[in-house]
Amino acid sequence: MLRATAPCWFPPGYPEAKKVAEEAALEASRHLGGEQSQAGAPEGSKMLRATAPCWFRPGYPEAKKVAKEAAPEASRHLGAEQSPAGAPEGSKMLRATAPCWFPPGYPEAKKVAEEAALEAPEFPLPSHQPAQSFGLWVPQMHKQASAFVDIQAEPQNRGPAVPPAWPKMVTESCYFPAQRGSACRLPAAPRLTERPSGVRISAPRKRKTIAHSSSPCLVTGYTDAKRTRVASSSQRSRGSKVGRQPGKTRNRSGMACKTTATTSSKRIVRRASLPSLSLKKPIILRSSGCQVPTVLRRGYLQLFTEECLKFCASKQEAEEKALNEEKVAYDCSPNKNRYLNVVLNTLKRLKGLTPSSMPGLSRAALYSRLQEFLLTQDQLKENGYPFPHPERPGGAVLFTGQGKGPGDSSCRVCCRCGTEYLVSSSGRCVRDQLCYYHWGRVRSSQVAGGRVSQYTCCAAAPGSVGCQVAKQHVRDGRKESLDGFVETFKKELSRDAYPGIYALDCEMCYTTHGLELTRVTVVDADMRVVYDTFVKPDNEIVDYNTRFSGVTEADVAKTSITLPQVQAILLSFFSAQTILIGHSLESDLLALKLIHSTVVDTAVLFPHYLGFPYKRSLRNLAADYLAQIIQDSQDGHNSSEDASACLQLVMWKVRQRAQIQPRHRSASPAALACP
């Protein structure tokens, strides 16, 4: 038997294999002849020769020859037992395994396979194919398809290869049943809508990664259970004995999973914070081409609103006043620096206001107190206030020396440099001449050895060449054009009403016919701007006078309001009994072409120490009496700022006269007027 299997000991095609097989066949024939051969045939030889094709490697020429010789013997041997119809079953079986004799793709294999397919039995028979293992040729059993080959792709393995039967470890039998039992008692976890992350937050600004487990449901459920039990135990008792702690998650090696335990115990629960109860900020929309940042405007608007809430009756009123104050500051500020200067002064003013509904506050009482500060008829005439013309309707008359030019009507005198120049009938300069002038005033100061006079703009001596240059000469012209004036009239008032108290300020520019109105602002006794608008002059503008007026070409270009429209609006506000407050108010009334005699002039109320005709500037008065700095921008004056400063100066005078000190630091000018 051992020698019969000798062909398997040699590699395919080895010459010694055939010799050993033949010798083994004779011995096998003698040994098996008497027991298994009923017909007396050498059964051992037949069986060995029938398997001869397996002795050779696929495609070896001798294999086919031996197979053909073995086929008739196998047919005779198996015909009587397995083939009732007498078919050569041995030949069929051998030829059915013929494709295994040749290497894959060998041309002869396909032909033999097609012939064998017709004679192959219905049940699959084992076939043999050589396989190389450790240098020996070992036959390997497999099943051969009859006509088609099915190809199945192996599943993609994303992890290390795991044997189909993982050996059960001792730790699994110890810890896994307990985990499965606790997991079965836990409630089902909510289904996540997003892919769960492998990162847990253990402490602020620290992250720890949890290792992936083969049973994520068990690990997740157990971790959540531990989280719940720890929280409940900490809330039940504080300072009591520590009870039984839940077991930590174990891994396959039997060690506790420190990452999971640490993460669950130090996990920080995020909670939604409640919105703070703060004041809702008023909205300021962004505007294109704005030099003042919107964020800066919103910040100061919030500050204005907070201050207005202290003295306004309602939140809506406070927001409206804050929006109005911020809008006025923004409209009169062409750049950021000017805006900051204006809003800071406005904020100071708002901090000094108190509610207008305070006990003892009466506008009628304030009106009666201001009666003693009104200008008399002589003061009005002396300071150049206009009076109605006795003969010409719409005309005005001045009782001071009116500006008289040279004898020639086409000759004018420049109000800035004092040079005479010629003009045409339209008021334009006949010749283009540059104007050199000093925009500052002449001031005398005490120095060592005496007093020295110099200009405030450049510190130059009087009579020196001007430090500024203009394209052409200009003139005032207000005292020469005294037509188109309107006069305030008396109005019937109710018993509880009073005529009103307003502060007024105007800005002007130079035209071909002199100074004309370009902006007017009216402020009431509560420091509220009730009217503020730009005005389009009637004649051509030659110099916008931006250094003092703060009005630019863009401001005038976007307005269509004319002087007659402004006069109509002011007549609806004012009456003959209304008190108007201003600094050198005669210049404003001349620009408005308005005749009004109930006025309080701060230039007269706070006289210059040298007496008339000298007058103190509004800037110096505000600095001395109000501790405020105004008109400190190179972009020009602010009419609302000047009007408010005049009103505060008058209230300061009322308080001083009544010798009443304010009870609170944040007292309004109107409240300070009452005892």
UniProtKB/Swiss-Prot annotation:
Residues 66-90, 225-263 are annotated as: Disordered. Keywords: Cytoplasm, Exonuclease, Hydrolase, Nuclease, Nucleus. One of its GO terms (molecular function) is exonuclease activity. It is an enzyme of class 3 (hydrolase). SUPFAM superfamilies: Ribonuclease H-like (SSF53098). GO terms for cellular component: cytoplasm; nucleus. It is found in: Cytoplasm; Nucleus. Residues 66-79 have a biased composition (Basic and acidic residues). The keyword Secreted does not apply. Belongs to the REXO1/REXO3 family. This is Putative exonuclease GOR.
